[in-house]
């Protein structure tokens, strides 16, 4: 689940859930959960990020790397940037690699979405920024405790995306494509959707 203030994923290799959110000081935080019956217990939370102003978390588990990519919006030197870390779960503990900026432009008011393509063994981040093109998809590859990215691909989206924009994405292994849902704070025509492959088009839902 990709939420505006928290994200949760299932780590299949560790048989645990991983939650990413803001800490009480607004730095990035992560904690491992173990489900037993109808209850859940937690390990010790960690904090990360060079910013004490991190919000809009999304996450996706990479089954090939057996790690999770946590994506969030961070205040870097007074400018909101798209940032991410690679998280590794071991038992009831989690560690993260060095923070990586996936956008050097302002990503304010954008809840990025991230999904894992199990066929390509890659992750894709969908996000909004103040540059041109404004809406992009970015493919990433996890290696060790870090992630590297290719060249952003511009998205042509429908609807009024001038204000807050939220993205949620999920990969369909049968179709071999990623479904992208996005919405805005001011949208009056509902949600929008699109299908991501090597190209991209979007249709109003």
List PLM regions with ranges:
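Polar, enzyme-active/binding microenvironments
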Residues: 1-205
């Amino acid at each position: 689940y990709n939420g505006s203030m928290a994200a949760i994923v299932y780590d299949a290799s560790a048989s645990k859930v991983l939650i990413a959110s803001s800490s009480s000081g607004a730095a990035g935080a992560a904690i491992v959960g173990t489900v037993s019956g109808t209850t859940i217990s937690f390990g010790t939370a960690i904090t990360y990020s060079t910013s004490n102003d991190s919000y809009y978390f999304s996450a996706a588990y990479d089954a090939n790397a057996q790690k999770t990519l946590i994506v969030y919006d961070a205040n870097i030197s007074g400018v909101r940037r798209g940032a991410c870390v690679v998280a590794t779960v071991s038992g009831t503990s989690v560690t993260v690699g060095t923070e990586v900026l996936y956008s050097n432009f302002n990503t304010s008011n954008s809840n990025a979405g991230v999904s894992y393509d199990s066929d390509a063994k890659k992750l894709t981040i969908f996000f909004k920024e103040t540059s041109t093109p404004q809406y992009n998809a970015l493919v990433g590859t996890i290696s060790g405790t870090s992630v590297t990215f290719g060249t952003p691909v511009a998205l042509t989206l429908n609807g009024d995306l001038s204000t807050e924009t939220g993205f949620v994405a999920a990969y369909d292994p049968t179709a071999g494509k990623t479904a992208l849902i996005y919405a805005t704070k001011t949208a009056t025509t509902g949600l929008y959707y699109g299908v991501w492959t090597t190209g991209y088009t979007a249709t109003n839902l």
